UniProtKB/Swiss-Prot annotation:
Domain of life: Bacteria
Cellular component GO terms, alphabetical: plasma membrane
Binding site residues for hexadecanoate: 89
Ranges annotated as spanning the membrane: none
UniProt-recorded Gene Ontology molecular function terms: lipid binding
Family matches, as InterPro entries: DegV (IPR003797), DegV_C (IPR043168), DegV_domain_contain (IPR050270)
Covalent S-S links between cysteines: none
UniProt-listed Pfam families: DegV
Protein name stated in the entry: DegV domain-containing protein Rv2417c
Function as written in the Swiss-Prot or TrEMBL entry: May bind long-chain fatty acids, such as palmitate, and may play a role in lipid transport or fatty acid metabolism.
Keywords: Lipid-binding
Length: 280
């Protein structure tokens, strides 16, 4: 048998990649009009980012069930679970408590990121598991990926950020932001302000510059995410392809309903695993 990798629906891994590398996921939740909607399971309105909804992490019951199934299917080889940043969701803490109940064969990794910042770490673990590596090695592969990953998001609207409460230090600048558009990064698991500029196109340009500076002439795995703006995401992917010839083209995916609620319509983000091979 082989080690089984589990993640959550913040990861934005396309279904074909999850299937290829046998990566399982548990749902995060959206609470809307008295309903508890499971990301990736229940039907969620396309315009959820416009609704007054809230988000919640994977439940202990869901995590325990997923880990126990994975542990059984691994034949005792173990489980590596890679989850959304502990600073952004209660999922990781619930996962830690669940793993402690199940014993040392379940290892939980804090991605300290979101979207494909989670996905790239899960992919690293999935590849190691597919190669037949033992539990410690698979866990180290995920942890090594965490140390290589950077994530940015250019935000077009401020309403969702004001409601979110997930942005470190946001109260200090949101009230005086006027029409300035923020570029955020994930720093040690927290969403923090990098820079404020006059237009979202300028914020996006700065984001592209930052990514290119990080990568240089090295290979890297790239992902571009968006909230209700695939054209903008495709433009970012094209710009990265032109400026980073050593990298395979970026995958482009929606940011997903949970993250969309926090950053709002028109947001475009980039996740990069510097030095990694592309997720093919």
């Amino acid at each position: 048998m082989t080690v089984v990798v589990v993640t959550d629906t913040s990861c934005r891994l396309p279904a074909d990649l999850r299937e290829q590398w046998s990566i399982r996921q548990v749902p995060l939740h959206i609470l809307l009009d008295g309903l508890d909607l499971r990301d990736g399971v229940d039907e969620i309105p396309d315009d959820i980012h416009k609704r007054h909804a809230t988000t919640a992490g994977a439940t202990p019951v869901e995590l325990s069930a997923a880990y126990q199934r994975a542990l059984a299917d691994s034949g005792g080889d173990g489980v590596v679970a890679v989850h959304i940043s502990s600073a952004l969701s209660g999922t990781f803490r619930a996962a830690e408590l669940t793993a402690a109940e199940l014993g040392p064969a379940v290892r939980v990794i804090d991605s300290r990121s979101a979207a494909m910042g989670v996905g790239f770490a899960a992919l690293a673990a999935g590849r190691a598991a597919a190669a037949g590596d033992e539990l410690d090695t698979v866990a180290r592969a995920a942890a090594a990926a965490v140390s290589r990953i950077h994530a940015f998001v250019a935000v077009a609207r401020l309403d969702n950020l004001r409601r979110s409460g997930r942005i470190s230090g946001a109260k200090a600048w949101l009230g005086t932001a006027l029409a300035l558009k923020p570029l955020l990064s994930v720093d040690d698991g927290k969403l923090v302000l990098v820079q404020r500029v006059r237009t979202v196109s300028n914020a996006t340009a700065v984001m592209i510059d930052r990514v290119c500076q990080l990568v240089g002439d090295r290979p890297a795995a790239l992902a571009v995410h968006h909230v209700a703006d695939p054209a903008a995401a495709n433009d970012v992917a094209a710009a990265l392809a032109e400026r980073l010839p050593a990298c395979e083209p970026a995958m482009v995916t929606a940011m997903g309903p949970v993250l969309a609620l926090h950053v709002g319509a028109g947001a475009v983000g980039v996740c990069v695993d510097v030095g990694a091979s592309p997720p093919a």
